[in-house]
Amino acid sequence: ISNVPTTGSPKALVVLVEFLDTKFSEYVGDAKSFYTDLLNKPNYSNEYGASGSAFDFYKASSNGLYTPEFDVYGPVTVSQQESFYAGTSGQANVALMVYEVVKKIDKEVDFSQYDTDGDGEVDNMYIFYAGKGQADTGTSGLIWPHNAWVSLSGYNIEKDGVVIDRYACSSELNGKKGTPLGVGTFVHEFGHVLGIPDLYDTEAQFTSGYTVGKWDTMCNGSYNNEQNTPPLYSSYERYALGWIEPTVLDPSETKKETLNPLADENKAFLVPVPQKDSEYFLLENRQQKGWDEYLPGHGMIVWHIDENKDAWMKNAVNNALSNPAGHKCIDIMKADGMATRDTEDGDAFPGTGNINHGSFLSWANKKIFNMTDISEDGDLLAFTVGDGSTGISSISVNDAKEGPVYSLDGTRIADNAKNLPKGIYINGGKKIVVR
């Protein structure tokens, strides 16, 4: 939820920051030139495995509608060692760091040009800080890449008639390899600037919930291929940002459809939930090529969306504990019924389990539509959608397999099939009926 422009070529502010004890490495050479190219150069590549620049990513994700210009300043050196700004939380004094950075670049920057929506505030100041970060090292004393507001720490910064409040930051180096990172974390954090939320459980330290994993850049996908190849924004993100107008399907009519890869055609289907304008399903075709090369699988991804404003505003759309909706608001319907990190390759249809049908329920537990005959011919998906067959082609009477049991929306509900109430579940990758 944001008023920042998501079309055209708006300017964005980026600053390179060094600490008393950490400077940019020899890998990046001239840091300003390196980051100017990493963010802006068309058809970019480098020796560290980059699949493109941030410009390339946004141009591809938006089908050419959004081509931002990133102005890079610095490097500037702040007054303390990195551990001081990181503190015990990984971001304890980063607001102070932002305050110092603004003072250091004030003479060469007209901050007013970075208020692209005219609300009196700089849209965002993005900081690349020298060295490694805490997220991919687990090392205390390093800053955790994040998105925040300095006003939450008591700072009021105003220059050139505009307020500098919101910022985001990420590290220079890969925590494992020690080489420069690609644009994965950058396009994730900048996604927040555009108005899209995290899709992981932001309270994951208190839960064990799996959401959409490597399938999405706003979840763990930002780390795909060492952050060099984040997956393109999904049909849901494109829809939210005004980059796609999905084709609406009426589930009361049985129809055969085909779908080319989202990366090639920028096309998706939307299945509405009756009497619920904020709830719907999105169908997209994802194939492992280009920016999507490092997805965990390929085929049809079915998104179940609930545009719950409170959950979006709190950045809690998929939280297990604090989500105002009481359920995941932006989730993938797992084809194999297993919502785990180890089974991500089975999330798509037909997927590794060759699951060619599915029945999809609203959050009120009402059947909305069925899909059958889901198949892939090269990159092309074909399927039949309607409200007819349940997709259960035959019934056999057997005991359920040992192992966890999932609801039809992919939520793990039991360690085994014993003592379950009546209903239809997923166990061992198959539907089971408890009577």
Model-based region annotation:
Residues 1-5, 384-399:
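Low-complexity, Pro/Thr/Ser/Gly/Ala-rich linker/spacer regions in secreted
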Residues 1-211, 215-226, 237, 312, ...:
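Active-site-proximal segment of zinc-dependent metalloprotease catalytic domains
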Residues 10-15, 123-125, 182-183, 216, ...:
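Residue-level detector of short, conserved catalytic/binding motifs and their immediate flanks
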Residues 15, 271-273, 404-406:
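A short beta-strand micro-motif
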Residues 25-37, 41-65, 69-72, 137-176, ...:
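Non-catalytic C-terminal accessory/binding modules of secreted extracellular proteins
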Residues 118, 189, 276, 408-410, ...:
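Short, ordered coil/turn segments that flank beta-strands lining enzyme active or ligand-binding pockets
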Residues 190, 237, 242-243, 261:
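C-terminal accessory segments of proteins
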Residues 390-435:
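C-terminal outer-membrane/trafficking sorting elements
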